[in-house]
């Protein structure tokens, strides 16, 4: 039996069918000939699809593919994947795109048993995903030969497997944080996204404003041995590399760390299968400060504030001159710093001192700018009618190479009253016969360092000179030291009066020629003694002079029974062969705590009980070469426990501690409530000696307003330059300008918060006459209606519905005398005509679109029904008389968002 020929419609019908089928082109499924066949397989011949087949395939077409949402690129937040692995979803082959042929039917010629490669041969799972194993090869489908000589057809049942996966949020790993306070937590290590990588490598970058640092506190820390957390400070600027603050082994819960810059990095690494619960860290910004400037040798420094804007003022001891800037300012920056290098204090070699009242002459440092050979001459001149008293505070001269001469007068020819080559050092000092003294120092390469300190003071001729006691204090009954005045002497800790015992007072006698009835005593460091004060100092014999050989001194230190002794070695420089021994107990028979020889750096020693014994031994005989300066040891009693004393929180504030117990290294951070400022250091540290680094601060209510500032083209007057509560600031403008705003601002207090000004700072604007309101047009309105408009202000006009605006929509007030509008106000006229293009709006537009579309659809359905009847087939192609040989084709979408889903079967016959 031959195959009947296919009937074709006439040309006019074909033309109509082509025009009507254009609307279906976009939604047609792919044909089987677009799929790539398996290499080596036979390429089938596919017959051209007629209109019925195209319409049938479109009716069974699936919905659009669901792809990645916009902005779901996981790269900014996910951890870095291992080398060679990518997190981007691979593109799908054309044959696997949803909706591209879930059902294909075609006329199969005789002898063709296959329609192309099977679905498992075309669908390949993307890398890194798992998919069900492909089914076995499909059996060849024999052609069906219906009775009655009908056309041979092929029926296919396609099984579509849809894989569905719940899309999880990406793991927040790499992150830049700029808030002033918050929390940093480890990523959710149990999520699918984090398990898809072999190594989790996260960096959290926290940065705040310049001038602020970052303080972190570890609240939770539970990491496995394979996990690592690094805390780094700095970075982010050229030449500023991050500096490691701590790692996992150094961190603990409750620990507080501070970054000295405005940037801090947290670097976290975790294996593919983490075992710990991660970390939680609280961070907050704090105000950075400049470091405390170093105190110059022979001088001191006073600091108003270490925060930006604070000042450091330097000054030198008497007899020294300041070299450098006297005042430095703390400047704000990534790391606040002072405006310059700290100055130094140097002693000058010679000079003239006019109108001398009280001061010192000090020898220059050995080996300085003056070199080893010195020739220094000083002239000290007091006011008319006064004389000078010169006290020898410290003198150490080389007998062979140094010489000191003092003359009573102001020239080298004045009479000599002291010569070091011939006279001993006068204990009572020297008194000039005139109003001047001439001091000359000669030194030629001395074997020992030169030490010289002379104190001078001027006094009236009708009274005694003011007494002086080095390393001690003087109290008197008459500050003017007239005849009859008494002066009483006492020594500083570590010194004792010499000669010892009473009398420790002298009297000014003889009204005709006033003088003291006895010499001033001296305070000298003694060799040994018993000390039972809570705090004190132990000095080497004759300190600050060099000790002499043949010393064997023993000091006993005793404090309360429940205390122990902290000994701090400030200076230790003894000769070779000399030794200082410390015994942990009462007497030299106790356990040896330490033996100190030669030069030693600063160190601290702690006794186990309330007693400590010190023994210094210097063998007799000529001293070894070199000068033994001696030693200075400070001691004080401390508690026996290992914690610093408890400090209460400040009133109107609070404090936070880095540790629960106040152990060594604990940091206390103080803060005040709004409206209060902190007086003192905001950070206290428990030091090694179990004392706090500074006194606890206090919170003081802020009673001043911030400086409101000046105004342009004007000036101000303030009732108080400090702007306290209740003060006033009055503003005035220059001629030609007018004040906009309140002329007087008042600083008033608030219960909560800092004091505030009563109003904003005014402005000075050019003085012009305002423009009058031009009026509202009939059938219209204007915005911002008011009677007067200042120069530069604009006014907009609008018309009601049904009216059109004739003229300028916006007019502006132009400054002048008088000010004028840029144009006349517009008019609102009735709309005469309507634009035809605007009639097609709303429902009319929808009707214009939907009516032709509906006609096309109805016409297409009619053509389809007509064509179906013409071919003699049922309307929908269903037939109960056919037998089927189902072919199951399984498609596996290679989209990583889907896995393990549902299965659908479609059974179609044409």
Curated annotation (Swiss-Prot):
It comes from the Eukaryota. GO terms for biological process: adult locomotory behavior; cerebellar Purkinje cell layer development; synapse maturation. Residues 123-145 have a biased composition (Pro residues). Residues 70-152 are annotated as: Disordered. Disulfide bonds join 173-202, 290-330, 316-345, 349-376, 464-508, 491-523, 527-553, 644-686, 672-699, 705-747, 733-764, 771-813, 799-828. The keyword Transmembrane helix applies. Disruption phenotype: Mice lacking Sez6, Sez6l1, Sez6l2 exhibit motor discordination, and PCs are ofen innervated by multiple climbing fibers with different neuronal origins in the cerebellum. Residues 288-347, 462-525, 642-701, 703-766, 769-830 form the Sushi domain. It is found in: Cell membrane; Endoplasmic reticulum membrane. It is a single-pass type I membrane protein. Expressed exclusively in the brain, predominantly in the neurons. Wide expression in the gray matter of the brain with high levels in the olfactory bulb, anterior olfactory nuclei, hippocampal formation and cerebellar cortex. Detected diffusely and weakly in the white matter, such as the corpus callosum and cerebellar medulla. In the cerebellar cortex, intensely expressed in Purkinje cells (PC) and granule cells. Detected also in interneurons in the molecular layer. Up-regulated at two weeks after birth. Residues 1-27 form the signal peptide. GO terms for cellular component: endoplasmic reticulum; endoplasmic reticulum membrane; neuronal cell body; plasma membrane. SMART domains: CCP, CUB. Residues 28-844 are extracellular. The chain crosses the membrane at residues 845-865. Keywords: Cell membrane, Disulfide bond, Endoplasmic reticulum, Glycoprotein, Membrane, Repeat, Signal, Sushi, Transmembrane, Transmembrane helix. Gene3D superfamilies: Complement Module, domain 1 (2.10.70.10), Spermadhesin, CUB domain (2.60.120.290). Residues 866-910 are cytoplasmic. SUPFAM superfamilies: Complement control module/SCR domain, Spermadhesin, CUB domain. Residues 173-286, 349-459, 527-638 form the CUB domain. Glycans are attached at residues 222, 332, 373, 473, 517. Belongs to the SEZ6 family. May contribute to specialized endoplasmic reticulum functions in neurons. This is Seizure 6-like protein 2. The gene is Sez6l2.
